[in-house]
Amino acid sequence: MAFFRDIKEDINVILEQDPAARTGLEILLCYPGIWALIWHKPAHWLYRHNMKMLARIISQLTRWFTGIEIHPGAVIGRRCFIDHGMAVVIGETAEVGDDVTIYQGVTLGGTGKDTGKRHPTIGNRVVISSGAKVLGPFKVGNDVKIGAGAVVLKEIPDGCTVVGIPGTIVRRHGKPARELNQVDMPDPIAVELECLRRRV
């Protein structure tokens, strides 16, 4: 049965990726991310079969028990790993690919009150670090790394590393996106002097 196969795969991914995980039993008892994903499966099924209220109730109970909010309309791929999942939010029209790792405080959200597709589509083998926000109806490619605290507001091609606010591509396929030298770097003394000048 696919449900149990998926759970076994999710447990194996955690055992492979998290050095703190010792056994499958420990994961089932102590990892809220696995429970959020387990309960998302029936909630998503109910949502797709037009039993939206029951799906939302399951989703809210799961949020209350785990601190992870996955809308039952969201599509989650296989072997997703939500590590330290507190305050993860995944919106209704979000799509998450296979082998994605999501850390605490991540939001896959919208940017307003638009209807229709309003949340991101995340590719395969993506790592979304702590506190990152991916906001809007665009695609994040395969093999992308999103740095902690980044705010991503536009499409990201395959193989990129994104950091900062707003999210800026700093690496493409393991190589710097552009070479920086001293001329490109801000002068910290000049920056501080400008701040002082503005105060006066």
Each PLM stretch: what is its role?
Residues 1-62, 66, 177-200:
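Terminal amphipathic alpha-helical/low-complexity segments used for targeting or macromolecular assembly
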Residues 63-170:
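Structural signal for interior beta-strand "rungs" in well-ordered beta-sheet cores
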